[in-house]
Amino acid sequence: MKKLIAAALLGILSIAHIIAQEKSKPNVLFIAVDDLKPVLGCYGDKIIKTPNIDRLAKMGTVFLNNYCQQAVCGPTRASLLTGMRPDVTKIRDLHTKMRDINPNIVTLPEYFISQGYTTSGIGKIFHPSCVDKKFDPQSWSIPFLVAKESDYSNGLPVQKHYQSPELKALNAKEEVLTAQDGKGKKKSKKEADDEEGARGPAFECLDLPDDSYDDGVSAKLAVKQIEMLNAAKKPFFMAVGFRKPHLPFVSPKKYWDLYKREDMPVAEFQEHAANSKIFSYQYPGELTNYSGVKEFAKFDKNEANEFGLAIDKQKELVHAYYAAVSYTDAQVGILLNTLEKLGTLNNTIIVLWGDHGWHLGDHDMWGKHTNYEQATKAPLIIAAPGLKAGQTKSMTEFVDVFPTLCELSGGKVPAYLDGKSLVPVMKNNKTSVKEYAMSQYPRKMDKADINKVEDGKGKLMGYSMRTEQYRYTVWLKNFTSDQAYSADKVYTKELYDYDKDPLEKVNVSDDKKYAEIAADLDKKLVAYFKSKEVKL
């Protein structure tokens, strides 16, 4: 009998020990922000109002030289959330589904499930068209949160974005989405959305509460979820995905009122770089899908990828973007305040990231979708219990987030991950774990060259190596890094020296003064390709 009692007591103590171990693990608050470039106070922007993200920055490490793997939502999110590059995930577009290609791939939330965490999410975490059921159900140990109409203080937004009474009236009459195509045939919603100017205005400014729009609702529901998770016995991984400042730039009027239109900055350099190829730029088709923009540009869609947006319209769009950033910043503050109120702020790893940058007029571009600095550079802030706050200029990239969170939470870092843990950098901001970051983007050759290639398609993949001083981009024909590299695949190259040319005005890849530098960077890039080649 005594033995049975002793055994039972031992079992109870063992269970209690396991529960105590689990509860002692830090929680994780994982904040994704759609299309957020580093226009933040903590990144040196003197105009933007982001007090809450700046507050987070004072708690953690600000990675000043952080880059995405591919400057478009689906691929960059897939890479960050798996710790694998686009040529491994095979997500290089906005329609390939991650598990159709890699059914057994382990996502970051799945990893935390294996470590005894409860994982929960709301908002845009994965790109919805690149995963099953829009949010990858197996990544979440409890059902992914989806807002209902009753969660919005002003009813569901029209076309998922707008609260304008005029647009709501139009929508009710189906005047927007059932336009005729000239042949008496009604267009599908997708066809209507894909037309220039068919998606409604590029921005909205109305005097409404925060929870009239998606991000205010997401913050409100996330607070309730965090309170529920915190009361449980297990550590939690809570992912909150904010949709602004993605187009359309909608936000309540009070955030617009933080700024004066005349103070809004416009890009200093609004031309294509000398010696560059036309194909490497992007006509702002995403922007012109919204109304009220195209008529203010000098050029319609053209082979030269020119746009020429009027300065007043540029300032208006920048104003709208900044207001949307401040709106999202306020929601971040709500999450931080919730953790503080619950007494768990000091036991929570907090990571905030914008999935890529955004061209706000530089190089005559508006959007992402390139290998240039303004598209590939993205904010990353990580705060963790026991680590001092600071900033670092060390080169980092989004594939590093997965292994970093593994180590910070006390877990083992999977050996197969493409990234490296940034914990050494967080402990010593002068150190570095890598020499360069790598981005990539698919394109097609300039039209004059497409007819010269056998398949008539002219597909290219541009691999862009960003070191502390240089960006070296090599455009390769019908090539991805899981294939065997050969020099005859090279179509063209770009090289930019940020010490002398921070605005990327001149491609110096053929400049004899840079021959030695280009050769050294090329050697590094070829070594990278060799390391990624899949041996058959």
Language model feature labels by segment:
Residues 2-9, 13-487, 491, 502-527:
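Formylglycine-dependent sulfatase
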Residues 495-496:
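Short hydrophobic beta-strand that contains or immediately precedes a catalytic carboxylate
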